[in-house]
Amino acid sequence: MIRKSNSLLKILFSSICLISGSAMAAPTTDLSKQIVSEKPGSILSIAQQDVTDLFLHADQRLLVNYRSRGVNDEPIVASAFILLPKGTPPKNGWPILAWAHGTTGVADTCAPSGDYAGGPVHSYQEVASKALNGWLARGYAVVAPDYQGLGTLGAHPYMNAKSQLHTVVDAVRALHMLKPKDFNQQWLVMGHSQGGAAAITVAAYGQKDAPELDLKGAIALAPGGYQYEGIAEYVLSHPNPEPSVAAFFPIVLLGAQAAEPSIIPENLVSPEMGNVLTQARSRCLSELQSDLKKSPSSIFRPNADLKPLLSYLKQQSIENMVPTVPLMIVQGTKDHLVDPRGTYAYYQQLCKLKKPTIYQTIDGGDHRDALRQSHTFATHFLNVIEKNQTKSYCSNFK
């Protein structure tokens, strides 16, 4: 239930009004005039959301629009939901978990902050909420960005490393804008699938991007994006892939176009695949997978020039990311969406570079099992960080 009167929310509204000089309305996408002069993380609007049964350990849930930075560092509006734990903040403030969600789609209806029972991302949110409840029970405040272009103006540059870095880091900054004394400078990032790649990018560049904050570590659950160009190469060599791949691939194409407009998916795909591409502009991944019963007979046009697409995708690959903070990777051995061999190859790469990395496998685990079982692994990771033992995990790696 929404609480009609809440002292903390009143304080938050008052604080934000003092920062912005204007009253806060419910989040809206028509904020372009405000964003140019605002600093990254500045809150542009705030509204209270229902604390549903999904988040039993949350005292409040807030929806914010905040100033962030896009693919080319341009000012953008991004949205996120915030979960505050029960009880009063500790003396040094609540530590923060930034949650980077997995692939939902590129349409605005795919933004997790707008989730509702029976909605296109609700089944995923049900799984994610169990993991986030564990962090709330630990006394962490949670901020969950939607990423650029999900629920806000503009297209979603799916899997663009720079954009995902910015929206995650600036969401943490936005949380500190609410009431700085209530939040600790220490924070962690955890992400799944698409968000796993985002968490790895934050692990590589988060300290440099936000030196005023204290990033302690990152957790990547079944992270996508190893040799990211491989998805296009796979489709090229398998012109009639299984429907799940055919439903997912338009998200890759539209995400690439959002970041690099010279990539025009309609010029690359077959007319039959073009119909799926059109659906992907307004439908979420779960809907696309449900709708597509049979793959198109071909994906690409004959002689399509894929070099710009492959070059762009390769630039977003996680093997380009070298973490500067401890990283834990969790991967199911029966994951059919993220190849465990690629995830392990990335771990090998980091160990050869002598980066503090923990690799946890889930025997027989599928793509979502890394998220379902993240609570146990997170507890272990926190203990390792607290004892400063992460360096030992790759010390015997050959």
Segments from the language model and where they lie:
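Catalytic-loop region of hydrolases
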Residues: A25-N92, C351
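Gly/Ser-rich "nucleophile elbow"/oxyanion-hole loop immediately N-terminal to the catalytic nucleophile
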Residues: L84-G93, R173-H192, A210-D214
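Short beta-strand element of the alpha/beta-hydrolase
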Residues: N92-T104, G114
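Accessory cap/linker subdomain of secreted extracellular hydrolases
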Residues: L221-N320
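C-terminal catalytic histidine-bearing segment of alpha/beta-hydrolase fold enzymes
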Residues: R301, D305-S311, L337, R341-K398
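Short beta-strand/loop motif that positions the catalytic acidic residue
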Residues: P323, M328-Q331, D335
